[in-house]
């Protein structure tokens, strides 16, 4: 099999595109229009948000890779014809993919966090790191525990939908005057974001 094609299958490229689409739709179609208040600085720069979405995609891609890594023995029995880990990529190479993707995800998240909040950048980075831990824990320990495993996956997907609102909160926390001016608008967007978040949680 073509290794490039197999790599994109390994990271579930179609799933990543769907996550990116959901995140951008929530931010640019729901939240962004509501923040056109004329107040300079009410909306962070697009590069910072795009970098954060890239971070999320790297982290989730790493989660898919480590999931297949821990599933290799089961996949050898259940779907040997679709096996990628150990057949196309060795287990060591697969681990390298996971480490690289996760590192790039955390690095992108750190840079985005610093861009939107000089004083509280560690908060968003800590949440992204927690997502990394959740995805790894799901693959390594909790997948066989049906309720816990499904809960971790659902929370991870729902986080992608809630991320834009959290991003905006951390950005506005830099300037209390702007936060006060657009606070009502921010709270107005919350119910809609929560509806999409809950929908994503239960549909996973």
Predicted regions and their residues:
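Multi-pass alpha-helical membrane architecture of UbiA-family
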Residues: 1-204
């Amino acid at each position: 099999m073509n290794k490039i094609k197999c790599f994109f299958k390994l990271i579930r490229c179609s799933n990543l595109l769907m996550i990116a689409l959901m995140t951008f739709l929530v931010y640019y179609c729901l939240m962004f229009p509501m923040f056109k208040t004329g107040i300079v600085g009410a909306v962070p720069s697009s590069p910072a948000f795009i970098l954060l979405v890239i971070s999320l995609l790297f982290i989730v891609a790493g989660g898919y890779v480590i999931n297949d890594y821990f599933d290799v023995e089961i996949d050898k029995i259940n779907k040997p014809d679709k096996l990628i880990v150990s057949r196309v990529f060795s287990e060591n190479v697969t681990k390298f993919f996971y480490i690289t993707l996760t590192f790039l995800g955390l690095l992108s998240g750190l840079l985005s966090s610093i861009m939107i909040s000089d004083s509280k950048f560690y908060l968003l980075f800590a949440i992204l790191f927690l997502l990394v831990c959740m995805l790894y824990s799901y693959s390594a320990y909790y997948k066989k525990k049906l309720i816990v495993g499904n809960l971790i996956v659902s929370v991870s997907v729902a986080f992608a939908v809630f991320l834009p609102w959290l991003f905006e909160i951390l950005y506005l926390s830099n300037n209390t005057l702007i936060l006060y001016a657009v606070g009502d608008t921010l709270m107005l967007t919350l119910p809609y974001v929560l509806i999409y978040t809950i929908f994503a949680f239960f549909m996973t």
